[in-house]
């Protein structure tokens, strides 16, 4: 059946090539229609309290939660009021709040509440709280930047989303371009034809283009998927095409009288099992992300799994067709291997493998403990460092006015007496520096008919009363999360299970709840699924344990490094890398164990280790270094610190996995040999 399918592919190779070229071209246009979402809060589960609160508020009120802070330096009160009018006139700006919304600015400020005044006006600097609608976010942020100039500052989620949108597109293109150059370089070193690297890149390019185009089925993808999807697909799928072409060359060398078509069919039949098992473990590892409640997980997991599947389809259909068309050029451009052999390295590893295995065993438990005791960032507040305009602006605003966030409490309309009691209770919380509400601005005893309609619709609408809280707190951290719990508990006393609370800090609190709950579930599923596949492949228990534990230890070491360096970790990067590193690098361990078992049929175990290292090093270094390079490129080029950290994790993880597979895993296989090997021959030990 398999042979018949492959025979049909090679005989209809020009039709196959035409179909893939057409699919790739169509995918280029389709990928342009895929929307990218840069707002991390959009990926909260639909049943999270803050998501429900936002939906309730958006259905009842026309204006959203303030999502930008704008600071203008060296202005008088009249000048600040003029800036407020200009800000409000910008297309996409829904609302602007300043001091005049809380106090009568015609009265000398020295005679008014200092805390309230300094929330909005301090050291001749005016701080405006702005609400920008999502649909016109990019244009509004650009217009505000033009209005205030380089000497003033703006920050907030609307700004970070706009900056991420503008920067990621160019950064991803730069990363991809350099990654392709590196992959071409490493392929030139590790292949024996000048044309072969171009064929491999053509196959990878077709698979990546089609994967990007078929993302249209999702409608919208996350910024993480947009930034990491293609380069991850490039790194993890690189060896499939190389393996097939090498099998084809081996078959032609072994059967010089056979036709190229027959050799290709033979190569496909011989390589299908190895390539499929390698791809399947990677796909399963990525699919574990689908179980995350935090929706970036399913978004990235499905896109990556789809990408690997498409890469496999490409290898078994497009690559045979392309290779058969181009193999005469491969023959003409054949050259001697540019890399030296790894025989000496194999003998070196056979000498140091036991100390390496012991060293890994010693650091295994400390690495596991350290990797689980990092300090985390959960939201978007720290995505841009002070080396960026946004990071510098955020620091400048916080230096003058302190950390601040805006939350919204929704309670049922009416019963202004209870609302007044709630307002008093909220004012009593030290971190609450101001409240805009019906009872605070109009007064509990004032009937709605006497309140100006424009003011009333901002505070009371759709059966709800809205209380806008300004809190002196960061958007995440222990203090911010404790404040969320305190405010929720306070409102619960007056409106038991009949209120909603929304805001950036509140959403980040729910993010923390969601993604920490995902951690154990996703990791256990990924490890369990990969282990089960290995169990079915190897039909024994010990070898899958050794292989999975080796890669898991590499993951623990990778994630322990920030702990020992005293660095915070983005929990999303932590969660994603745990699954991706397993899926992307367990192939190295599988390949090594497969070749070791083959060599043990004719060699003693020490010779088999040396031969295995010598044989697999080129293949493992090709894919491992590609993963590391694209990761480090992402870390170096991305101004988004979440993406940058994810990239650095990929880079370090690829190198650590590479080192463990080539240096320590041989020692474990050597020690476990009597339990995992049943050789056909039992040669004497050298």
Predicted regions and their residues:
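Surface-exposed, low-hydrophobicity interaction/linker segments
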Residues: 36-38, 104-105
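Membrane-embedded transmembrane helical bundles of large multi-pass transporters/channels
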Residues: 1-36, 135-378, 493-686
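Structured non-transmembrane domains adjacent to transmembrane bundles in polytopic membrane proteins
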Residues: 46-68, 72-158, 375-376, 382-543, ...
């Amino acid at each position: 059946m398999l042979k018949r399918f492959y025979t049909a592919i090679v005989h209809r190779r020009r039709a196959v090539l035409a179909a893939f070229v057409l699919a790739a071209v169509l995918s280029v246009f389709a990928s342009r229609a895929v929307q990218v979402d840069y707002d991390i809060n959009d990926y909260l589960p639909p049943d999270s309290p803050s998501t429900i609160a936002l939906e309730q508020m958006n259905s009842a009120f026309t204006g959203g939660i303030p999502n930008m802070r704008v600071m203008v330096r060296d202005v008088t009160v009249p000048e600040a009021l003029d800036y407020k009018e200009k800000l409000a006139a910008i297309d996409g700006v829904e609302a602007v709040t300043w001091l005049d919304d809380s106090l009568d600015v015609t009265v000398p400020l020295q005679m008014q509440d200092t805390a309230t005044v300094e929330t909005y006006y301090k050291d001749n600097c005016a701080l405006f709280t702005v609400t920008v609608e999502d649909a016109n976010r990019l244009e509004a942020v650009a217009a505000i930047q033009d209005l205030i100039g380089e000497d003033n500052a703006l920050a907030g989620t609307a700004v970070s989303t706009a900056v991420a949108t503008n920067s990621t597109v160019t950064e991803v293109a730069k990363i991809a371009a350099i990654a392709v150059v590196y992959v071409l370089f490493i392929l030139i070193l590790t292949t024996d034809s000048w044309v072969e690297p171009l064929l491999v890149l053509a196959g990878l390019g077709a698979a990546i283009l089609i994967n990007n185009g078929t993302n249209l089925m999702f409608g919208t993808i996350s910024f993480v998927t947009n930034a990491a999807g293609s380069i991850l697909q490039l790194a993890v799928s690189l060896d499939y095409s190389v393996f097939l072409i090498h099998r084809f060359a081996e078959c032609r060398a072994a059967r010089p009288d056979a036709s190229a078509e027959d050799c290709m069919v033979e190569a496909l039949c011989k390589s299908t099992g190895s390539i499929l098992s390698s791809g399947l473990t990677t796909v399963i590892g990525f699919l574990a992300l689908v179980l995350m409640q935090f929706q970036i997980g399913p978004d990235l997991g499905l896109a990556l799994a789809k990408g690997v599947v498409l890469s496999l389809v490409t290898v078994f259909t497009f690559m045979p067709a392309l290779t058969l068309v181009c193999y005469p050029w491969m023959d003409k451009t054949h050259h001697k291997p540019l890399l030296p052999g790894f025989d000496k390295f194999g003998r070196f590893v056979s000498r140091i493998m036991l100390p390496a295995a012991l060293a890994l065993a010693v650091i295994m438990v400390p690495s596991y403990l350290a990797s689980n005791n990092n300090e985390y960032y959960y939201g978007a507040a720290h995505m841009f460092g002070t080396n960026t305009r946004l990071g510098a602006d955020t620091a400048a605003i916080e230096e003058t006015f302190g950390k601040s966030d805006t939350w919204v409490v929704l309670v049922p309309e009416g019963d202004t007496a209870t609302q007044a009691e709630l307002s008093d209770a909220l004012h009593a919380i030290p971190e609450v520096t101001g409240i805009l509400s019906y009872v605070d601005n109009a007064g509990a005893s004032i009937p709605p008919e006497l309140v100006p309609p424009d003011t009333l619709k901002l505070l009371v609408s759709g059966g709800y009363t809205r209380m806008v809280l300004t809190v002196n707190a960061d958007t995440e951290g222990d203090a911010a999360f404790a404040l969320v719990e305190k405010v929720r508990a306070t409102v619960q006393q007056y409106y038991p299970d009949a209120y909603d609370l929304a805001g950036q800090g509140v959403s980040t609190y729910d993010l923390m709840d969601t993604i920490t709950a995902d951690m154990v579930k996703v990791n256990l599923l990924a490890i369990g699924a990969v282990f089960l596949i290995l169990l079915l492949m190897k039909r024994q228990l010990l070898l899958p344990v050794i292989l999975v534990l080796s890669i898991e230890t590499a993951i623990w070491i990778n994630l322990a490094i920030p702990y020992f360096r005293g660095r915070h970790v983005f929990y999303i990067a932590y969660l994603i890398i745990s699954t991706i590193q397993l899926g992307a690098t367990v192939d190295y361990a599988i390949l090594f164990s497969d070749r070791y078992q083959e060599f043990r049929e004719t060699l003693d175990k020490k010779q088999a280790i040396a031969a295995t290292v010598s044989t697999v090093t080129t293949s493992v270094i090709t894919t491992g270094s590609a993963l590391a390079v694209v990761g480090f490129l992402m870390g170096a080029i991305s101004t988004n610190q979440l993406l940058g950290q994810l990239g650095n994790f990929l880079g370090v993880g690829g190198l650590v996995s590479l080192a463990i597979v080539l240096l320590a895993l041989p020692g474990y296989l050597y020690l476990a040999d009597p339990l995992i090997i049943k050789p056909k021959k039992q040669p004497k030990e050298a």
